[in-house]
């Protein structure tokens, strides 16, 4: 078996012990802090004695797909190409959903590990990620969302519902993430993969603030699985795709800037196009509202004028040109607009008011997407060495850290 693989200009030492990398969707660090203070997460509370706790930066836009793909490629979106759920294809003049693996421009560490002879398993909460994460992977790969459809030929495993002992969970539930962890435990104790990637959903974090009973219960559930993985002898590495913040005013009303309406009023209809890369089929989570937007300008709209106009709107943190955004956030130039707009910590960006259905938001809006959700945990159940070689820790360094930097 090959002991070293090279993927996207980085080298990875293949692990001799089962290694589990976990992406906890929407894991603002305060969730862990509050759960520890409430006595709900004893394993995480004791981890500093034998493990390592660090903080890193996620990719901006701080959304699920760009960050999960960055983690499994060990590279930013400028390398792998996935910079959101949607981009605007200038040639076809259509908004394109980027859930298909054909938009992925780089190999994954997972697929390369499998080629090197390792047994690799991937379990995701939502099926939208399975196709991307499992690209060219010969191993085990399935989602909790469609666990009832899992079969040996397509997913590399079977009878997963019976093995886990849970029904197929609702996509809008904490159970969807628990299914991921329970499935991971079943795989660890039976097939014992060399490497496992588990990716959850941020349903709980979108609805419940850190320290609330619901949030603490969710983290207590995860903590119990982390402990089980540890007891089974696995190397456990935990990070997040992004953080999470309230996006409301002082009395809980959503703070929304409808950029398309504002731009239409300033420049006229159809002179600009606002694209929200957070948009996905699961709008109950966030109403397709996040703190990152990209804007396409028609010829008649001067870029400098549009930048000044948008930057002058209260709640806008920054407006960047395409080249500035690509340099700062390492994004692919052909998949973002002329401008990138970032909302402040308490503000989300919408397109037009009539394009957003907020009826599913039964609690004060919580979302992500901006720089304000960039700080994420990097937690390991082992001591690490050689960290001086990192100028800046990123969530997509986690596989490198787990495989190459164990003491």
UniProtKB/Swiss-Prot annotation:
Chain positions recorded as Zn(2+) 2 binding sites: 202, 206, 368
One MF annotation (Gene Ontology) recorded for this entry: phosphonoacetate hydrolase activity
Any single GO BP term: phosphonoacetate metabolic process
Cofactor(s) recorded in Swiss-Prot or TrEMBL: Zn(2+)
UniProtKB keywords: Hydrolase, Metal-binding, Zinc
Highest taxon, organism lineage: Bacteria
UniProt binding sites for substrate: 64, 202, 242, 368
Top-level class of the enzyme under EC nomenclature: hydrolase
Keyword field contains Nucleus: no
CDD domains attached to this UniProt entry: Enpp (cd16018)
Pfam families in the record: Phosphodiest (PF01663)
Function in brief: Specifically hydrolyzes phosphonoacetate. Does not have activity on other organophosphonates or acetates.
Record family assignment: Belongs to the alkaline phosphatase family. PhnA subfamily.
Assembly mode: Homodimer.
Protein name per its UniProtKB record: Phosphonoacetate hydrolase
Organism: Pseudomonas cedrina
């Amino acid at each position: 078996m090959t002991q070293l693989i090279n993927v996207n200009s980085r080298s990875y030492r293949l692990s001799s012990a089962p290694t589990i990398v976990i992406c906890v969707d929407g894991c603002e660090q305060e969730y862990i802090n509050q759960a520890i203070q409430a006595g709900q997460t004893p394993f995480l509370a004791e981890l500093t004695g034998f493990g390592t706790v660090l903080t890193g930066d996620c990719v901006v836009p701080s959304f699920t797909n760009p960050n999960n793909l960055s983690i499994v490629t060990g590279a930013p979106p400028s390398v792998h190409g996935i910079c959101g759920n949607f981009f605007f294809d200038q040639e076809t003049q259509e908004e394109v959903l980027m859930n298909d693996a054909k938009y992925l421009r780089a190999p994954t560490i997972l697929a390369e590990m499998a080629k090197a002879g390792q047994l690799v398993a991937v379990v995701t909460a939502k099926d939208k990620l399975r196709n991307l994460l499992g690209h060219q992977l010969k191993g085990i790969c399935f989602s909790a969302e469609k666990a009832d459809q899992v079969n040996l030929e397509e997913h590399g495993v079977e009878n997963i519902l019976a093995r886990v002992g849970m029904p197929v969970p609702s996509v809008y539930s904490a159970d969807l993430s628990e299914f991921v962890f329970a499935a991971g435990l079943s795989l660890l104790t039976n097939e014992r993969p060399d490497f496992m990637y588990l990716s959850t959903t941020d349903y709980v974090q979108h609805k419940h603030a850190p320290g609330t009973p619901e949030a603490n219960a969710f983290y207590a559930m995860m903590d119990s699985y982390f402990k089980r993985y540890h007891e089974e002898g696995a190397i456990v590495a935990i990070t997040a795709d992004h953080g999470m913040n309230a996006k409301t005013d002082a009395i809980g009303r959503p703070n929304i800037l409808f950029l398309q309406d504002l731009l239409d009023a300033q420049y006229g209809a159809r002179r600009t196009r606002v694209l929200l890369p957070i948009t996905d089929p699961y709008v109950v989570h966030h109403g397709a509202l996040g703190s990152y937007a990209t804007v396409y300008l028609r010829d008649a709209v001067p870029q400098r004028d549009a930048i000044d106009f948008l930057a002058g709107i209260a709640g806008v943190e920054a407006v960047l040109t395409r080249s500035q955004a690509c340099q700062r956030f390492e994004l692919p130039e052909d998949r973002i607009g002329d401008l990138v707009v970032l909302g402040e910590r308490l503000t989300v960006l919408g397109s037009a008011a009539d394009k957003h259905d907020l009826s599913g938001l039964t609690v004060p809006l919580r979302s992500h997407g901006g720089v304000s959700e960039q700080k994420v945990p990097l937690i390991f159940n082992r001591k690490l060495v050689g960290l001086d070689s990192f100028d800046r820790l990123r969530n997509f360094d986690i596989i490198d850290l787990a495989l190459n930097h164990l003491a």
